[in-house]
Amino acid sequence: MQRLYPNVVWRKDKTQKKVYLTFDDGPIPECTPQILDILKAYGVKASFFMVGENAVRYGQLLARIREEGHAIGNHTYHHLRGWKCGVDAYVEDVEKASKVLETKLFRPPHGRMGGRQKKALLERGYTICLWDVLTHDYNSRYTVEHMMRVVRKYVRNGSIITCHDSLKSKDRILELLPQMIAYLRSEGYEFATL
């Protein structure tokens, strides 16, 4: 996959023992506040790739995320699937979200978009960020124990770890997050934002 997207951030500095927790799809009142509470309790900052329409609908959560010092990324305005629309429509949706979120940090929904869409966003100054560790917290077939095995096996210096603040992930992420933070700290990792 990384060969298909060479101008995309998959992982940060491999020489530093830092990891980057990221959350996609929010903010939503059903779980974003609880995630923020957990992060605050552990003194961890994360990066939130937000859907623009959610950020507008739940502006108080966008404000809280900003106030608490987390990084903000763009996840399109309507959670658009890039492979199902043209370049102009996709870029327009990203730009609409950018006006709300005030960021040039971008992650495509589902981690997928077309090459022409990627090129157009890079030309407009966006930094496109994917991940090297996906927790699968949105998938009810996976247990929290399985997700922790993934974290233990694949996290390394500079890892970008993708989680979700969504209805699909709610129960699993709220159980996983404290365990994951405690484990990563025990391994000597620091947490940073993108």
Predicted regions mapped to residue ranges:
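Catalytic grooves of carbohydrate-active enzymes
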Residues: 152-194
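Hydrophobic alpha-helical transmembrane segments of integral membrane proteins
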Residues: 2, 105, 174-175
